[in-house]
């Protein structure tokens, strides 16, 4: 299910393309939920700026896939089907996992908090009925910024940081993980 980093498109995505891509992802999720009546993990990379598909985002994605598989194995949860693809919004993964949806969401939240790259992953868990379990459902604060302690949404809306600073931080986190052989 890994993606080959060297095949990244480096396409600068427009807002309309991004919105269409999100609608297409939602449609794929509904098809998967009909095929597998178990929770669905929908996994993407948080990538600031217009380029969502790069060597860096694919490597971050691949680490996330490895971590999700390890999480399922550790918990004894069966992955019924998994797939990876690249859309205008970057690398995407879907895993149908036979596990209680709320337990799965709590475990993925912990993974996002404990893994060095977890802040760069957006891991959604959908119930078999299609409900997206949110961080808010667990009284968790919104994601924090990569560079400061503010809400990431507030910094993004206000364009608080330079894009190059955010991208450099992403790459530094990835290089640290690769240097330490963290999965």
UniProtKB/Swiss-Prot annotation:
Domain of life: Bacteria
Leading EC class: transferase
One matching Pfam family: CitX
E.C. number(s) listed in UniProt: 2.7.7.61
Keywords, comma-separated and alphabetical: Nucleotidyltransferase, Transferase
Gene Ontology annotations of biological process type: prosthetic group biosynthetic process
InterPro entries linked to this entry: CitX (IPR005551)
GO molecular function terms noted in the UniProt entry: holo-citrate lyase synthase activity
Swiss-Prot/TrEMBL catalytic activity: apo-[citrate lyase ACP] + 2'-(5''-triphospho-alpha-D-ribosyl)-3'-dephospho-CoA = holo-[citrate lyase ACP] + diphosphate
Role of this protein: Transfers 2-(5''-triphosphoribosyl)-3'-dephosphocoenzyme-A on a serine residue to the apo-acyl carrier protein (gamma chain) of the citrate lyase to yield holo-acyl carrier protein.
HAMAP family for this protein: CitX (MF_00398)
Family: Belongs to the CitX family.
NCBIfam families: citrate_citX (TIGR03124), PRK01392.1 (NF002383)
Protein name per Swiss-Prot or TrEMBL: Apo-citrate lyase phosphoribosyl-dephospho-CoA transferase
UniProt organism field: Escherichia coli O139:H28 (strain E24377A / ETEC)
Gene responsible for this protein: citX
């Amino acid at each position: 299910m890994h993606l080959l980093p060297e095949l990244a498109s480096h396409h600068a995505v427009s807002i309309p393309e991004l919105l269409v891509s999100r609608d297409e992802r939602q449609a794929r999720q509904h098809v998967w939920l009909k095929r597998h009546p178990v929770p669905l993990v929908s996994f993407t990379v948080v990538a600031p700026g217009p380029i969502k598909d790069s060597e860096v985002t694919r490597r971050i994605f691949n680490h996330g896939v490895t971590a999700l598989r390890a999480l399922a194995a550790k918990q004894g949860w069966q992955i019924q089907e998994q797939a990876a693809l690249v859309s205008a919004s970057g690398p995407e993964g879907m895993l149908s996992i036979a596990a209680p949806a709320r337990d799965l969401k709590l475990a993925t939240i912990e993974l996002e908090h404990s893994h060095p790259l977890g802040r760069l992953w957006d891991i959604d868990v959908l119930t078999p009925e299609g409900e997206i379990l949110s961080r808010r459902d667990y009284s968790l604060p919104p994601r924090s910024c990569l560079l400061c302690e503010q809400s990431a949404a507030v910094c993004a809306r206000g364009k608080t940081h330079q894009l190059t600073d955010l991208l450099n931080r992403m790459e530094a986190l990835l290089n640290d993980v690769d240097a330490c052989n963290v999965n």
